[in-house]
């Protein structure tokens, strides 16, 4: 079982094989997903919401990301580990972007993911020149939520769609190995996918992308605060956990647990 690399992903796109990607934030989930042979595990700054309880990804720090990257990396043998670069970790200077990207690689990530294009393309290029693989992220970029005023659909208008395609080409030119495309119309995503050679991984971007990514807590039914239209719940693990905990509480209160089989 060979570990997934950037070459693996390029070959999948060329062969028309879909790429699978999920978020992971700890050793236990990473080990489970890795055993299922998920291609990419994203240590997303979404941990700010689903793990740390923030309202957005903006408060997440480099220290938060390093901590969770280390845990996920310990649980993977097959999956590529990609780490989000958090808010303000790459926005100031190319030098700081390289230093922070390096911290995440040393923590165990194979690559980093950076949101945006024009405002940060010099930073993306610097990180790639430092021999660190970069995954791009276009469309809805959650770290810019305060600028855009919400999590609305992007690239609805023709002008914005054309800009999205241009941005994808720019990112490809500077050397990103893949691009996440978030919350854009399916036909726009199809145009982007056909315009570049690098894999396009969609989240709320329709079926024409080269792969798909979801937040694991969303697709497992564990995060009830927010459920976007693009999320499919493959299980209701939250309900299973609640039922199990309620049963445990009941058995402890009634003196049924621990029984003889659980005692020494």
UniProtKB/Swiss-Prot annotation:
Cofactor(s) this protein requires: Mg(2+)
Enzyme Commission number, as recorded: 2.1.2.11
Keyword Zinc-finger: no
Record: residues binding Mg(2+): 45, 84, 115
Record localization: Cytoplasm
Example of a GO cellular component annotation carried by this entry: cytoplasm
This protein's pathway: Cofactor biosynthesis; (R)-pantothenate biosynthesis; (R)-pantoate from 3-methyl-2-oxobutanoate: step 1/2
Cofactor binding, note field: Binds 1 Mg(2+) ion per subunit.
Active site positions: 182
InterPro entries attached to this UniProt entry: Pantoate_hydroxy_MeTrfase, Pyrv/PenolPyrv_kinase-like_dom, Pyrv_kinase-like_dom_sf
Entry keyword Secreted: no
GO MF entries: 3-methyl-2-oxobutanoate hydroxymethyltransferase activity; magnesium ion binding
Residue sites binding 3-methyl-2-oxobutanoate per the record: 45-46, 84, 113
Catalyzed reaction equations: 3-methyl-2-oxobutanoate + (6R)-5,10-methylene-5,6,7,8-tetrahydrofolate + H2O = 2-dehydropantoate + (6S)-5,6,7,8-tetrahydrofolate
Primary localization class, coarse: cytoplasm
Coiled-coil segments: none
Main enzyme class: transferase
Pfam family, one: Pantoate_transf
UniProt entry keywords in alphabetical sequence: Cytoplasm, Magnesium, Metal-binding, Pantothenate biosynthesis, Transferase
A GO BP annotation: pantothenate biosynthetic process
Family under the similarity heading: Belongs to the PanB family.
NCBIfam families per the UniProt record, alphabetical: panB, PRK00311.1
Known partners and oligomeric status: Homodecamer; pentamer of dimers.
Protein role: Catalyzes the reversible reaction in which hydroxymethyl group from 5,10-methylenetetrahydrofolate is transferred onto alpha-ketoisovalerate to form ketopantoate.
Protein name as it appears in the record: 3-methyl-2-oxobutanoate hydroxymethyltransferase
Source organism (scientific name): Caldicellulosiruptor saccharolyticus (strain ATCC 43494 / DSM 8903 / Tp8T 6331)
